[in-house]
Amino acid sequence: MPAAGSDHHAAPLLPRTVRIGYGLGSLCTGTFATVPGLILLYYLTNVLAVPAAVAGAAVFLPKAWDVLINPLVGALSDRSRLRGGPRRPFLLIGACTLPPLFALIFAAPPLRGAPAAAYVAVLFLLAATAYAVFQVPYVTMPAEMTEDPHERGRVLGWRVGFLGVAILLSGALAPAIAHADGDTPESYRLMGVAVAVLLAFGMFGAWAATRRAPEAARSEAEPSLRAQLAAARSSTPFLYLAGMWTLQALAIGVMLAGVQYFATYTLGSAGAVTPLFACLIGPLVLFMPLWNRLARRKGVTYAQWCASLLYTAGAVLLAFTGAGGPAVGYAAVVLVGIAYAGLQLLPLTMLADTLAADAATTGRRRAATFTGLWTAAETLAFALGAGVFALVLAATGFRSSDAAHQVDQPDAALTGITAGMSVLPAVLAAASLLLLHRYRETPTVSHPLQEEPARAD
């Protein structure tokens, strides 16, 4: 008698070029998720002299637009009859529009305060729209390329691997260029162009390399946003999973928005953001295979529990940087980085399994509808993270300035920076565990990574 789950292997393996080429798209998703969250709020408050609360709104509102545009892009992609399939043409449209728009965000005319915030907000909104056109179909593709959960895991492995490369490159490159000439508008303009080149390489690479991917099984598009939300409510596992990841993405977004302030005002050097990112991303590359192995042996939900608890512990430890010195801060970020490796891989694996289970249970393919809602929630959470951190700055009396006139910060603002980087993300991550517990209790979700016996290679 064949082993349970062996029918998964009847699906043909994807060409290696497709798996690797698909992963290239994460050079876009990782970069666009990292650089605005890391740089944009600081650029507004410390280069363009925008008050913290106004800067937070300029970062948050354009990304909040994704709550509307992402599900619409998902439905449009589901209904698409474009030549090249329902997904890849959207990848090409995004690749042609996002890189130049991103460069323009940091090419502001000589403005200060509210006018500068308005310029950045408009360009950021346009860039967020272009990103949605690329990201929603991109995230959908693994669930449609193959029925084999192990093959989906391989595809996602390349995606998350390139995600780590993107975060490392952009997280180190963008601040290094921006700070090279003393945080001047010119240095930020050069940084925007360099990051735009990285975006273009990943986006065009993913579009070209997935030409040989299997024809996507068309999802059924829900006719309206209300219908899409109703579809999501019909899938309890998806609701719990999306809620869990939204809280965790918010925690990551808050921490990401604060890391440049933490480097400048807690560690005492704007350039300290580079070793901080090395502590964060080094474990991402090294520990991702270990998280994948743990998921195979113990189950993906068990591994997600471990990653979530470790992230919470690392965030709590970060609060003791002032008392213990920079070494404590760097050690805490290493723990967060180890956890972050799992949080980048495991929720995506759980999402792909949940989408496949929904299709098998309902007989309907709603992958793009669900991923549109997923990416909208994720993007909103990351954007809200910057907005929440900006509110912490405003509430604690942070003083904005331009590149030529730096100012000293009050003690309350320095305390707020540390708390916003540590205590607040820890609370959000702890709250996500309740939803993860509910997801684990949902009987309709099966995890083939855990249930299928190991096979010899």
Language model feature labels by segment:
Residues P2-D457:
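Membrane-embedded alpha-helical bundles of multi-pass transporters/translocases
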